């Protein structure tokens, strides 16, 4: 008998594949995002939420992530806030919800943090690897994309926190880290657990 877990790219039964950032216990109505957020995380989240839609019992999403792909994080946020699910989603920062993970945290109907959890807000950035080369036209396009992401994040956080856009831009530029209490005071979380 082969005891090695099968690799899957979707929510299957009670667990997601070991190589995925997203893990789920469907019976407990719990999803965990632990690790880097990628397009595969978004696909796994879609599958999990669709499977959980068979019941109206609320779902808890635990987050411990250094961040990752901003497009995927915004897509997960949109699913949480605009998806037509028969349940409410509570998001919980368990260790760190940095960068793109902070955006996912904001998607919860209730946003909670463990007492020692931290959040990180910073300006969006692109990471280049594998010897990618850019010319001036590419740089102009990348700069426009970063500006658009920055605007979207500021608008989203203004809506969630009630802060003025200028204050959010300023805090993004300084790479602000929030303790759980500071996150509550800022409006990024609702409760410390």
List each language-model region with its residue ranges.
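Terminal-region recognition feature
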Residues: 1-193
